[in-house]
UniProtKB/Swiss-Prot annotation:
Family: Belongs to the SecA family.
Molecular functions (GO terms): ATP binding; metal ion binding; protein-exporting ATPase activity
Name used for this protein in its record: Protein translocase subunit SecA
Superkingdom of this protein's organism: Bacteria
Known catalytic reactions: ATP + H2O + cellular proteinSide 1 = ADP + phosphate + cellular proteinSide 2
Pfam families membership: P-loop_SecA, SEC-C, SecA_DEAD, SecA_PP_bind, SecA_SW
Recorded topology in the membrane: Peripheral membrane protein
Assigned EC number: 7.4.2.8
Keywords annotated in UniProt: ATP-binding, Cell inner membrane, Cell membrane, Cytoplasm, Membrane, Metal-binding, Nucleotide-binding, Protein transport, Translocase, Translocation, Transport, Zinc
Main location: membrane
Note describing how the cofactor binds: May bind 1 zinc ion per subunit.
Gene: secA
Binding site for Zn(2+): C943, C945, C954, C955
């Protein structure tokens, strides 16, 4: 009560934040009349002035009003787009390192240009992060024009670029790219053998588009670079063959003489828990598996791997559905992103689950992989000095953004009032009744011409609905992972009169749905592409035709059919005589294509404008959801496709008690309410109690998923600190500064390790383990301890430690004289890197094994998290000891042969780089309980540890 009164008097935190920014908006608007008078050159010159002021120590904050005003003026001149006042506020929120929640259609892409330009002035780099390569390329080409016009450089990072192209893109003032590419580049850099090969700069400022998708939906997906193991794949087929012979059972509660008065019993061979996404064998099931696999005890430690793969095979059959969780294409299992409905080529589930699904579908089984480098998105993005983000739906996860990323969410008001009514949910008892009602509503709205966007949660459901619409003779487009190639094109035209579009989840996110159609999109359809793509096609065709050595007339005729209107340009170039300047020809062809394209856009503008008015009169775009998602945020994203920029629209969800969300999390309560109300078959219900029950079910799932993400980051924070130590050590070695001092430090610590392991205080020296001491000293340092009885009597822990150190220094001095300074420094550098990389790889495997079993500590009344921290620390310290020992041992024992062998030794480092040009696509697993995304080194690729050998002969043994 008191809190509500205070809020009424002083406003909410969000209102106070917005109130603080409006005066700055006024200052920006006051600068506009003066900037309008400037020529393009004078406007561009402002950037040089800002850079000069920044170099003299002026802060970016103080330059914000002027820089934003300049950026807005450039947007008007280059794109014909002027930032609205609310977009200026969005830009300020991003610059201050917060999340801007802006509704769909409010121009988030344009907003990002403001903080990007301001922070780009510093020259320290700005990363604009998007969810896929298409958006990264589109935004860099589109919005990048503003930055280029103002004199800033723009780069783009997409899959398939060479290292030199990536380095150039990262060196730009503003770099567009995907979260996966940024993350993998960081991991790849930290596996390289030369600092000059690094592609990334220190992390300065990141603007994350669709921040909820990247920082929350993908937060359970670690990025992993991995190499294959030798394991046979036969075991997956053998286990898969027995799963259909097992009978699914149920958990039954029976009366019992216990504290709760109830006891659980199990029927069948296995039970399934859909909430936890797990499947477990019953006692009967264990006996049956043992009989089928001809083993005595499934729980014998020697059979743990068989048990693990049996459980994964159970999950594959009982919990993962084809055309829902994955599709099979060209004998390959491809994961479907549960949040976007997009296919994720190259991504794989971990811990043998993907192999189990491949066996189930009879697809080719790929080997499991071993981790070489890994990081989560949470820890990657927390490395930026300043992080910000924008999305249409962040407020429901505001608490998580604040707790994990220290990011506050500011809700930006819409430029025009939202006119979209969100109608109450309609609930039916069965899915059949629900789909009948959905088809009825689609038919009714389609007949009057109102465009409809139908949201489904899986490919299976979208195709089922499509079949029903075909039977009714209703024309429609289906947009799911199987038809993703034309995604942006289909979504852009979903607002045309009479259009019916079925889309899985948030497919097409990032593309605006314009009522009446998009003139640019229609022009692209008529033009068969963009001016850029058509020009690329033309140049390829022209060069191919030239090679046929045809007469000029035939040459022009052969191209005229496919590229009408371009021939006068080509003829003009040919008449100039001499060699054809292909670059000049390409420029002129692009200009002609742009002119033709603009004519098509102009032709479509009045058509789309007239259709826009018709669609507005019909009520705008209607969103029809066929199922609630686990997250309210995903439902809000679907609704947000309608009602953009003050346009009318509407939304409604149709549900049934057979939907996954209600069936797993809320069915009993909802079913009880419906029974009490006497709902008959075919009859729908819209009731506040039902809506609240559904929201409570969603909140339960959201809380559960938040706990999983929080749990993951708490565990990964331990690894993050260890990763920082290793990567910092690698960078120092690559920097070459004081590398010999680093080695002597390791040598001194190695002596300390031996003393700590074998020397016992307050115990006579004769009782020490001298066999262990002499063997270890001989193995590590390469010299023999000459011990006499007289010496034994005089040895103390202190003088023994000092004697060992002195002898080790003398031995190192001998090696230095033998090799010379330059060669010794080079040997130290290469050996240190090879040993660190090999030991780090083994350490990651040990950590994976530790994670798998740590949960069992809870049964011993121990906190698994604390146990994990303690054990992970011990594993790390053991690894550091092994690194010291192995580096010292190799330096003291290494032999350098002929000059030819030394040249081969020099070649070992560059081979390390080759692996990154040969790897497959990154593999990030979707959010099925902590899963992994992997990018693998092939069996015959150079080993990522840098040895110069093939992977199968080195770390892949």
């Amino acid at each position: 009560m008191f809190g509500a009164l205070i809020k009424k008097l002083v406003g909410s935190k969000n209102e106070r934040e917005l109130k603080r920014m409006w005066p700055i908006v006024e200052r920006i608007n006051q600068l506009e009349p003066e900037l309008v008078k400037l020529s393009d050159e004078e406007l561009r010159g402002k950037t040089a002035q800002f850079k000069e002021r920044y170099s003299r120590g002026e802060s970016l904050d103080s330059m914000l009003p002027e820089a934003f005003a300049v950026c807005r003026e450039a947007g008007k001149r280059v794109l014909g787009m002027r930032h609205f006042d609310v977009q200026l506020i969005g830009g300020m929120v991003l610059h201050s390192g917060k999340i801007a929640e802006m509704k769909t259609g409010e121009g988030k892409t344009l907003v990002a240009t403001l903080p990007s330009y301001l922070n780009g002035i510093s020259g320290r780099g700005v990363h604009v992060v998007t969810v896929n390569d298409y958006l990264a390329k589109r935004d860099s080409d589109w919005m990048g024009r503003i930055h280029k016009f103002l004199g800033l450089s723009v780069g783009v990072i997409v899959h398939g670029l060479e290292d030199y192209e990536r380095r150039e893109a990262y060196a730009a003032d503003i770099t567009y790219g995907t979260n996966n590419e940024f993350g993998f580049d960081y991991l790849r850099d930290n596996m390289k053998f030369d600092l000059s090969e690094y592609v990334q700069r220190p992390f300065n400022f990141a603007v994350v588009d669709e921040v909820d998708s990247i920082l929350i939906d993908e937060a359970r997906t670690p990025l992993i670079i991995s190499g294959p193991t030798e394991d046979s794949t036969d075991k997956y087929y053998i286990i898969d063959r027995i799963i259909p012979l097992l009978k699914k059972g149920e958990v039954i509660e029976v009366e019992a003489n216990t504290l709760s008065g109830k006891r659980k019993t199990y029927t069948g061979d296995f039970t399934v828990d859909e909430k936890a996404k797990s499947a477990s064998l019953t006692e009967e099931g264990v006996l049956k598996v043992e009989k089928l696999l001809k083993i005595e005890n499934l729980y014998d430690p020697r059979n743990m791997e068989i048990l693990h793969h049996t459980q994964q095979a159970l999950r594959a059959h009982a919990l993962f559905k084809r055309d829902v969780d994955y599709v099979v294409r060209d004998n390959e299992v491809l994961i479907v992103d549960e949040f976007t409905g997009r296919l994720m080529p190259g991504r794989r589930w971990s811990d043998g689950l993907h192999q189990a699904i491949e066996a189930k579908e009879g697809a080719k089984i790929e080997n499991e992989n071993q981790t070489l480098a890994t990081i989560t998105f949470q820890n990657y993005f927390r490395m930026y000095e300043k992080l910000s983000g924008m999305t249409g739906t962040a407020d429901t996860e505001a608490e998580e953004f604040h707790k994990i990323y220290k990011l506050d969410v500011v809700v930006i008001p819409t430029n025009r009032p939202l006119l979209r009514p969100d109608f109450p949910d309609v609930i039916y008892k069965t899915e059949r009744e629900k789909f009948n009602a959905v088809i009825g509503e689609i038919k009714e709205l389609h007949e009057k011409g109102q465009p409809i966007l139908v949201g489904t949660i899986s490919i299976e459901k979208s195709e089922e609905l499509s079949e029903l619409l075909k039977r009714q003779g209703i024309p429609h487009f289906v947009l799911n992972a199987k038809q993703h190639e034309k995604e942006a094109e289909i979504v852009a035209q979903a607002g045309r009169k009479g259009m019916v579009t079925i889309a899985t989840n948030m497919a097409g996110r990032g593309t605006d749905i314009v009522l009446g159609g998009n003139p640019d999109g229609l022009a692209r359809q008529e033009f068969n592409g963009t001016p850029e793509t058509r020009t690329e096609e033309f140049m390829a065709a022209f060069i191919e035709t030239l090679s046929k050595d045809l007469p000029e007339k035939e040459l022009l005729q052969s191209l005229e059919r496919e590229y009408p209107g371009i021939m006068p340009v080509v003829a003009a170039c040919l008449k100039q005589g001499g060699e054809i300047d292909l670059e000049e020809l390409e420029r002129q062809v692009l200009a002609e294509h742009q002119k033709q394209f603009n004519l098509l856009v102009d032709k479509n503008k009045p058509v789309c404008a007239a259709e826009h008015d018709e669609v507005v009169a019909l009520g705008g775009l209607h969103i029809l959801g066929t199922e609630r998602h686990e997250s309210r945020r995903i439902d809000n994203q679907l609704r947000g496709r309608s009602g953009r920029q003050g346009d009318p629209g509407s939304s409604r969800f149709y549900l049934s008690l057979q939907d996954d969300l209600l069936r797993i999390f809320g069915s009993e309560r909802v079913s009880m309410i419906m029974d009490k109300l006497g709902i008959e078959e075919g009859e729908a219900i819209t009731h506040g109690l039902i809506t609240r029950a559904i929201e409570n079910a969603q909140k339960k799932v959201e809380a559960h998923n938040f706990e999983i993400r929080k749990h993951l980051i708490e565990y990964d924070d331990v690894m993050n600190k260890q990763r920082e130590v290793i990567y910092t050590q690698r960078k120092e070695i690559l920097g070459g500064n004081e590398i010999r001092e680093s080695f002597t430090g390791m040598m001194e610590e190695a002596v300390g390790d031996i003393v700590a392991a074998y020397v016992i205080d307050r115990t006579p020296a004769r009782e020490w383990d001298w066999q262990g001491i002499t063997d270890t000293v001989q193995k590590v340092f390469g010299f023999h301890l000459d011990l006499t009885p007289d010496l034994m009597d005089r040895i103390t822990p202190v003088n023994f430690d000092e004697t060992l150190r002195t002898t080790a220094r003398e031995r190192f001095q001998q090696r230095l004289t033998e090799f010379g300074d330059d060669l010794m420094d080079h040997l130290i550098k290469v050996i240190m890197l090879q040993v660190i990389d090999a030991q780090w790889k083994d350490h990651l495997l040990s950590i994976d094994h530790l994670k798998e079993g740590i949960g069992l500590r809870g049964y011993g009344q121990k906190d698994p998290k604390q146990e994990y921290k303690r054990e992970a620390y011990k594993l790390f310290m053991d690894m550091m000891l092994r690194i010291r020992e192995e580096v010292v041992e190799k330096i003291f024992w290494v032999q350098v042969g002929s000059e030819e062998e030394m040249e081969q030794f020099e070649l070992e480092q560059p081979q390390q780089r080759m692996v990154f040009n040969l790897v497959d696509e990154e593999a990030a697993a979707p959010a099925q309980a902590p899963s992994k995304s992997k990018r693998s080194a092939g069996r015959n690729d150079p080993c990522p540890c840098g040895s110069g050998q093939k992977y199968k002969k080195c770390c892949g043994k």
